[in-house]
Amino acid sequence: VGAGGVEESLKKFFRAKAWALLHDPPHKMWVLYGTLKLTAGGHREDAVKVWEELGLREALGDPADSEEIVHAADDMASTSDRWITNFAFANVVRVFEYNKLHNIFDPKHQIDIRPLRRDELDEFLRDLAGELKPFAGDPRRVYHALYALYEVEWAARKLPPSLADTRAPTHTLFDHVYATALTLNLLWPDGKVGGYAVMVDIPGIQQVVGAARKAGDFWAGSWMISAVTWLTLWPFVWEFGADVLLKPSPRYNPYYHATLWAQLGGDHRLWSRFRELYSSLLPRPVGGMFEPQHAVRQPVIPGTACLVLPRVRPDGRELGRQQLEREVRERFEKACELLLALASGEQVSEEPYAAFFKLLSEKEGAQKPSARAVVKLFKIIKDAEPRAFEGLLRARVAVL
């Protein structure tokens, strides 16, 4: 594929994913009620208007080019709901108005959804457009920024979430559109079901944690598992988009937000949106001081992960099953190698890992845990638990 072809393939790929996120506008519920509209049409016309307001027509092109495959992903991401509700409401011709969000596991727990005001929507779109603008020249960067900021901006402002379907009030519009973006990977590039589910599992986790206890460093063992897992996943997340990450979810994920923030250049205005989100979720004073270098020091990534990947790369190259399994194993080995390099005091400048390691290398003070504790931990595991050490360096990988 020539340079021009690669550029067009990238734009086509990330245009489809961005349209998957925006095919239903964030205020869809109120469009259907007729109380808040950006156009004289329905919610599809408003979705196109949102696309334009965010500057994505200039950055990614016409969303109509992605309509067919996104429509298929939309159906697949919400099939069970639509089967049930379309049957139950078959004779209902008017819009079913409902303004409560219920806990899917215990529907007795519910919250009221207040009406969204026009000025709130306008301000949200204006500010989000300003945050996306610096990345408009790069399809991958603008999509990552959209994916990371879209829900975060809404939540940080404490705006009311639209229900995805008022007839099934157990999930929000954000739940649906983010699921649609993930589902698109199974249909890319021709709408036919395919793609891969990739399971990654780090063996010997209990031995690693046990060795950390023996070393008197409870943090190091858990953090090492988190860091190895994340560094195995990050190259795929950066190349294909965060929507490929099924477990752990990239939504409300401080590792993803911090690593992406550094990868996109480390703009402090950008991090302020994430800080606002976490300050509302974390107890004070932790939330108010939550910085990107804090995020990547928390051992919150599990030792088991799942990716959902398309059978064709963003640049148009085919991705075979055996090739993918080999790449995952190589990324895991690279993650272990780079962590040892960091712990030995070496600088890591290799892409796309450099941003993560730059965050780790920032000074935090003596009271903060240091990544160099990994050296001591590796030695203890190797001496006391040789089988665990050998297993740690050989992840279990399954590609389905």
Which stretches of residues belong to each language-model region?
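Regulatory and interdomain segments flanking nucleotide-handling catalytic cores
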Residues: 1-400
